[in-house]
Amino acid sequence: MKFLTKSLLMFALILTMNLNIQAQESAPSLTIEEIIVTARKKEESIQDVPMAVTAITDQLGESSVRRIEDIQAFAPNLFINRTPGIGSGAAITIRGVASLESDKSFEPSIGVVMDGMFLGTQSGVLLDNFDIERIEVLRGPQGTLFGKNTTGGILNIIRTPVSLTEVSVDASLTVGDFGRQDVKTVVQVPIIEDKLGLKIFAASIEHDGHVYNTYLDRHAGGDDKLNYGFALLWEPNDQLSLKLHHELMEDKSEQGVYVNRNVVGELACTITLIGFDPNNGCEKDATDGPDTVESDGSNFSDNEYESTIFTVNYDTENFLYTYIYSNRDMDEQNMQDFDGSAARLLRMNYFNDWEQTSHEFRVTSQFSEKFQFIAGIYDWEVDYAQNWDVYDLFYQLSRLGVGAWGAGDTLTGYGRDSYITGLPWESDLASNNGQTQKTESIAVFASIDWYLTDQLTLTAGFRWTEEEKDFLGGNAGVGYYP
């Protein structure tokens, strides 16, 4: 499947490169273009929105932004970092309110919304700069309209619209050092002009990584992602609009690497706690440089994110009725090697299954310019299962009473190419953390704007939520117990 998708991407790219080159038009006169946003779940000028909003539009295609985290250079008070151990996971901070996900029991305080679908976990939110029309950064609490736990703000991501009038192929190829190869394609096909249109998109992102693993003899910390899907838009008349969006993202990227900075001759490498170096990074050559690592782990990931969004809009003279159905299914498998050495000391395996389903129905008034409101109901369900294995050799040694960890025994026969011999256990598995959770939530919300004058607007809003979480979990220690 991946080979077929990449072949189609390359074909679309070649097709685009063979299009006739059009003469460059003269530069247009300088004008201030109105920016329309949907920060309050309705289209309005960004100048009329009574909140702190940054909209990033044309800058996306013209900038060096590769992934969502790069937009922090364009939006004040926004910081986005990658979360180790979480596939395409994000640690987002807005105005000092941070959202760092340790597990998925609670929704993040910084919400991410894609085409009206609230992403209830930070996994898979670091999208590449591909098929995105606009990103809105909403600062401050957004609980009235977006609900959940959005006390810090929202990243509102809007995909490019489906064209009903023009056939187009937009493709790009980026190559670079360290095996970088990005292929992206968006194809627009009007099936029935002004009535029915289809958009097909696909992207392949590959990069070997900037760090070289001398133990595994290959580069580490690279990207390997495939994102593809389609959007179908049907507008049978001027009032009714139906849009179906479906996409799949496969992420097999390595979740970064832990570099051990100890080298032979330094103090940390002259101390042996239990008869061997506490980490075998001490065996690396001091001249290897800061871009090398000697680790037995690959920090691999094998994650799939499948999303479906169905949106219906019915536009009348006085009201706009909107219904949004969304479903997101995630299957994550990640491994993290925390010691950064060739010794198998501390690592974790993460297995997560997540499925969310939501229904939203809302009404937006259009009968008055002085008085406007949005009211709706929101239903949300999540099924989540977690299974984490912790492999901790230090823990096992402490249970055995070995060396500095116990009664002073000497541990021998352990090196970078072999496991400990002669000890009475079969695995360094120390503990297992398993849990399941089911969440059911329903909410009713409304937001009212009363435009008293051109300079003064009175805004009021409320949200009532009833939520139930059923949780079952525990932690079990395993291994050798003397």
Regions found by a protein language model. Give the residues of each.
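Transmembrane beta-barrel strands of outer-membrane/channel proteins
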Residues: A171-V175, I200-E206, L244-L248, Y325-N327, ...
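Solvent-exposed loop segments that connect transmembrane elements
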Residues: V211-H219, G256-E294, D337-R347, D389-G434, ...
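Transmembrane beta-barrel architecture of outer-membrane proteins
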Residues: S63, G89, S109, G152, ...
